[in-house]
Amino acid sequence: MVYYDILAKELEKLYEIAEKARAQGYDPKDIVEIPLANNMGERVAHLISAIHEQLDVKKTAELILELEKQYGFLDWRVGLKLIDYALEGKLIPYDDILKRIDLGVRLALGYITMGVVSAPLEGLVELRIKKRKDGKPYLALYYAGPIRGAGGTAAAVSVLFADYARKKAGLYEYDPTKEEIERYKIEIDSYHNKVARLQYKPSDEEIEFLVKHIPVEINGDPTSDKEVPSYKNLERVETNRIRGGMCLVIAEGIAQKAKKIYGKITEWGKEFGLEHWEFLGEYLKLQKEIQAKLAAESGGEIEGKEIKRKITLFLDEIKKEEITVKYPTPAGKYLQEITAGRPIFSLPMAIGGFRLRYGRSFATGFATSGIHPATMFLTYGFLAIGTQMRGERPKKSTIVTPVTSLHPPIVKLKDGTVKKVHSVVEAIKIANDVEEILFLGDILTAFGDWLNEKANLVPSPYVEEWWIQEFDRAAMKKTDYKIEFDVMKPRKLFKIEGLENLSQYLGIPKDRLEEIIRKPFSRKPTIDEAITISEKLGIPLHPEYTPFWVHITKEELIKLIEELRKAKIQNNKIYFHESQKELKAILEKLFIEHFREGEYFYINESMTKSLLYQLDNLNLEKAKKEFDNAIDALDLVNRLSPIEIRDVAGVYVGFRAGRPEKAKMREMTGRPHGLFPVGEEGGKMRNVIEAYNKGYVKAEFALYYCNHCKRYTIYRKCEVCGNKTKEVYVCKEIINRLKTSLFKQYKDWKKVEEEIASHLWAEAVTHSKNNCREPKRYSLIKLNIKHYVDRAVQKLKLFNIPKLVKGVRGTSNKDHIVERLEKAFLRSVSDVYVNKDGTIRYDGTQIPLTHFRPKDLIGVTIEKLKELGYTHDIYGNPLEREDQILQLKPQDIILPYGILVKSRLNKNKIVRTDAAEAFKKVANFVDEELKRLYNLEPYYNIEKAEDLIGKIVFGIAPHTSAAVVGRIIGFTPIQGIIAHPIWHAGQRRNCDGDETAVMLGLDALINFSREYLPDKRGARTMDAPLVLTLKLELKAVDDEVHDMDIVYNYPLEFYYETLKGSPAKDVKKQCGILTLGDFLKEEDISKIPIGFTHPTKSIRLGNKVSLYKRLKTMQQKTEWQLKLAERIRAVDENIVAEIVIEKHFMPDIKGNLRGFSSQVFRCTKCDTTYDRVPLSGKCPKCGGNIVFTVHEGTIKKYLPTSLYLARKYKIKKFTKQSLFLLDRRIKQIFGGEKKSLADFINS
């Protein structure tokens, strides 16, 4: 059976069961509320129908498909034509032109965001027609924070869409006043400095230009409590608070993406009457002038260095050419927002940091990088699989996964030994003996990440995958040997002819030679073989035996030769005395291994032979003779060596730690089991049982009426007779009149509220909302909770009633609809917790995976994998063994297993929090729910984690509104959600540290309801599965994944282009590097062939939990952060200490000090807050104690650590004095600094 047929069949089963359950009436609606979208058009239409309910989903989806045939997929013109249809009333025949504009703009925005994010619903809050100064109508757009989810381009294009609708509707252009322009300037500046850093902050001149020329008003709702410092109370600006949505649209939208929009306008703007947007051309000139001016004022950019090197090019013709090697500029932006406890692994381009290497492994690419697993343990465990790092290039953020075929880290031990750490076992064994990490090892970055960033490549180090291709080219020129290179085939499958001839020519046995050719990472030549190959084929020396010559100066090279001449050679090893400190220092810089033996150090046989060979048997005279002619140490070595020596250092990349890896069950505040309100009666634990003991709950409930029992209830299905009930309404106007009347009687509003809640007032309740001017679905009720609990227990036939069943304080949805109490009881029994929409979710860091070995997975057998469709490995061999490499199917996922933590309730107890355990509990809950509440057969019947294999789950990323179908195929001890890059892209996310959530399929279909979603912006539609995608289309996922390279080999020309700093987009065309984007026409994405350049022994081999998570206090985290800085040579601990104090501790202390003077006060008993302490000193509401909300401890928590760092490390005098002054100020406020009278007089 075809892969997607299997998924469709499983999903169909789930829908059938869910529909039977929902039809019974226990849920807010009788239908499953997660519609299945068959294509992107349906997804978009389903999303917009959440606001425009009359929209015909099928008709709209068909229209989108027709327009795509005319203009192309995701073309902005499709959005413009959708606006035409909306304005003509062809989609919904609204009488109001504003409603037509609203429909058209939201639909167009939904289309270009692929119907995945909630930005068209929650980010674009409202459109209004307002009056210009001359009284003519113009269009105003109101944005809010969720517009961020659309991305900068879509946010900017939404303004273009709105202007197109404005012009078509005959509205006039916006006429900003001078005051409004100034307000935009100061508000964007305030947002950037006080709320959140903008990716791009336009200058005042840019803002003024844009506001004057954009034909619609970009407005917004307030998203922050902070007010603008000036230009308040403007007539057409409704708020004095900062409008985050507006700031994002102007700064990160139009200003940042102007070039992209202008390109489209010049292409087809006139055709659609948008030629007036050509003002963006003038804006781009202005932007360029301003940026050039700023660069000049700051002394200009530091240019990356260029070095001219003569290297042999093995192209059609083998010849030596001079190439200008272009190095990048150090970029220290990643250090600007450092957090205490999250270490810096290397400073910008610092020698010994991570060496940049091009390639992709099983679990890298799509913004994820690979490092050697030993590095994770040598860095005290701060790095774990899935840990985020922020760095210089190619992307701002990445997460790390293990790749064993990379260059390992190099360490200096306490006895002076310098060695490579080849394995995790070795790293753990020597961990306590390490004095310094000289080199962190490679970081593997996929070519696709450079392509996506539209970046220029940086020089690659000379590595095995480069060397072997030069070997191939030279061998074919020198002998009757042929190898068929193919970027889309692993070297193991390359067709080779004439191997016997080559074997005879080189004097290397045929079998050994084939191993070297086919397995360049694991079968490296010996030093003798390497020298023979280089001499006979004329290729550079193998990188395994090449020191990092560019790390030292020419003077140091001369010193090296002089010192080595003093050393002795014994048993083919160089021995030197420990007193030769200069020699040792140079060897450390060159990353040459040397080992302690008594008073001596020795260099192993291979490197001894290599050094003597490269340095022409330590020919000092020749070295001195060529000294002035050589440009650097590497050039000088090449003048001594009989064979060519290449640069194995390349470029180092600076990184710091970002967010730690994550894998845990989603829990709302209070960890409720059900969405049932228990008010104050539930106590601090919000416990239904505690409320039961009190006999009632006072909260707001939606009301229903049972015609059979002639009684009111809070459920759609009567808990007494089981019949469906009718919605009833409460007249707000009558309730207000009753309150006024009761107040005259009681003279106390508290008693009035109590009286109103204690009765359902017959005159206020109506069965039709047409009978009242202000109908509402809910009322404040003093509910007989005992009745509902007893009925729930009776229905479920529970004999052991749980002591803790947690509800919520109060419901937050529009009509205060509650979840059935039965569900809360069943979740409590199963030990699972509900999310705001009725589902149960498991959150995790998004980790990409394209290939795996069965042995990497827990809980799945070879037979089970075959059953799931994994029949052959990547080489075409039938699946028989656990070490075979398989290509992951696009919607299969791997979940965390075996995560152990201390219990919250009992610190001596260890509990599991992994997804395997979590979903076992969820499956048990769903089965109990089916059996006890819905009277249906259980579906999952899970006894052990292995039983979850093959089960359907839904994935949904934060801030999105569309879920994606996934299938569990196994578990690993990695803390993250491991899935195909296309699956992650289907949620409009990459894998740079983002997270996703996973829900068990049947739990979501049965228990999700839009009716439960909170009635506030960002919660009504965001992070909710409003629509479900079964089959992902490559063209309909985030286009970043289209740039992911899928080749097994980068061609030789690629490495030469990296030296030149060529643009990645040009290299793709020139070198024929295939990416997923080359397969956009492939309908079945499971058939796309995907390769990898670097194998790894196991995706599980590495640290699983970051030290950052294991350490409990900030002081501990900071101490270890500095301890690691002292251990890594590429980091200066003094700089780290200074950055931590300046960027984290001092701003935090100052902020809390400001907050202390403007704090509110809280009641310890009922949590009511007050702006000022009540005169009685007690809570007027309940008599509880009043306490601070900003405590002295909060202000001083980082002060001791800051002072300790300031004294221990060499930091700037200004920073140190600022800190000491802050310390004195705090002591003056809270005490601790005693002054004598003399001190006071002299102060």
UniProtKB/Swiss-Prot annotation:
Assigned keywords, A-Z: DNA replication, DNA-binding, DNA-directed DNA polymerase, Exonuclease, Hydrolase, Multifunctional enzyme, Nuclease, Nucleotidyltransferase, Transferase
One GO MF term: DNA-directed DNA polymerase activity
Classification via InterPro entries: PolC_DP2, PolC_DP2_cat_dom, PolC_DP2_central_dom, PolC_DP2_N
GO BP term, pick one: DNA catabolic process
Catalytic activity: DNA(n) + a 2'-deoxyribonucleoside 5'-triphosphate = DNA(n+1) + diphosphate; Exonucleolytic cleavage in the 3'- to 5'-direction to yield nucleoside 5'-phosphates
Catalytic activity, EC: 2.7.7.7, 3.1.11.1
Family classification: Belongs to the archaeal DNA polymerase II family.
NCBIfam families assigned: polC, PRK04023.1
Function of the molecule: Possesses two activities: a DNA synthesis (polymerase) and an exonucleolytic activity that degrades single-stranded DNA in the 3'- to 5'-direction. Has a template-primer preference which is characteristic of a replicative DNA polymerase.
Assembly with partners or alone: Heterodimer of a large subunit and a small subunit.
Protein name listed in UniProt: DNA polymerase II large subunit
Gene assigned in the entry: polC
